[in-house]
Structures are given as structure tokens and as C-alpha cells.
Amino acid sequence: MSQQYTLPPLPYPYDALQPYISQQIMELHHKKHHQTYVNGLNAALEAQKKAAEANDVPKLVSVQQAIKFNGGGHINHSLFWKNLAPEKSGGGKIDQAPVLKAAIEQRWGSFDKFKDAFNTTLLGIQGSGWGWLVTDGPKGKLDITTTHDQDPVTGAAPVFGVDMWEHAYYLQYLNDKASYAKGIWNVINWAEAENRYIAGDKGGHPFMKL
């Protein structure tokens, strides 16, 4: 049997991010969508193990896409839940990340300019994907980037990400992605983002281990 991954518990109740993300969305997103990625990853890894034992090279090649897609979905969502927090627990409060805030202001000129740039990137995503603030290298360089479908961030440390798949917002916002992108700033966990930024600045990504 291959290593079995499990669905991580949410660090807050399903209704804790309202009114910005509804309880219904959170329950479906976590219990159904994320669980599906976990199940798919476990199944793909088991298929990989059996193919390796059978020396079935074509099968080994074909299963890689399922590992990438479902593994990426598991990584991305595990990071996503932790980079959100209820308002009453500090969600949306950039002052909880003084080091990161200073780096953002140095990179973009102001926090508001950074938010505008990030939202523009989010709304420019075609189809399904993620928007990320990442840090790259020991000098703490910050950049905004996107990943397609469930591809995870590689070559940099994700500081925080925003899920732009329709399942993350459609039941509440319909096709109004702009309102979803605007509202999610109220529940960004800046304390967690600060920890990730500092860890990434030191060249470590301990938060990436699942």
C-alpha cells in the first residue's frame, strides 16, 4: 500500500468566513472538492506502485498526470485553508505581518497598489487556476504569479494563494468574480502569510510538507 494522504481539518468552522465566503461553499469545497483530490492522489499513487512492480512503463507514464493534478489540488487547498482566517481571528489585518507589509510596500509602492495588481492578475485568469503571492530567493523578492488548473507553485515559496476555480465562489457570487476577489481580502490570514514569507526568505518551505 502506498502512503495514504488524508483530508486536513479546517482550522475554523465552516461558517467562520461569512459573509465573504458562505458556509455552503466552504462545506462543498472542503468536504467534496478537496476530498476528491485526496482520493485521486491516493489512487494514482497506488496505481503507480503497482505499475512499478509490474515494470509497466506505459502505465507509469500515463499515471503521472493524475498525480500532478490531484497532488497539486491537495497541496493548493491545504495551503489555501491556512491562508484564510475569520475576521475575529485577525483575518484581513495586514498589520499582523509587519515584515511582509514592508516588503510589499517596497515592491509595489503601497499596499493598495499591491492589492490592485493582485486583483488584476486574479481577474485575468482564463478558465481555472490560482493566483499567488510568492517569494523567491534569500533576499525575499516578492512576485505575483498564477498557476493553471491545480498546478502547484514550483521554484518559489507561496506566501498566500487565492483559488479562482468556479467552485470557490460561484454558488455565492455567480459570475461576479470581481466581488469575490474584493471580499477575500477581509479573510486573508496575514499572520500565516508572514510566517511563510519569513520561512521562504530563509530558503525553507516547511509549510509545504503535507
From Swiss-Prot:
Gene Ontology, cellular component aspect: mitochondrial matrix; mitochondrion
Cofactor note: Binds 1 Mn(2+) ion per subunit.
Residues holding Mn(2+): H29, H77, D163, H167
Compartments where located: Mitochondrion matrix
Major location category of this protein: mitochondrion
GO MF annotation terms: IgE binding; manganese ion binding; superoxide dismutase activity
EC id: 1.15.1.1
Superkingdom as given in the UniProt entry: Eukaryota
Catalytic activity annotation: 2 superoxide + 2 H(+) = H2O2 + O2
Entry cofactors: Mn(2+)
Pfam families: Sod_Fe_C (PF02777), Sod_Fe_N (PF00081)
PROSITE patterns assigned: SOD_MN (PS00088)
Protein name: Superoxide dismutase [Mn], mitochondrial
Organism of this sequence: Aspergillus fumigatus (strain ATCC MYA-4609 / CBS 101355 / FGSC A1100 / Af293)
Encoding gene (name): sodB
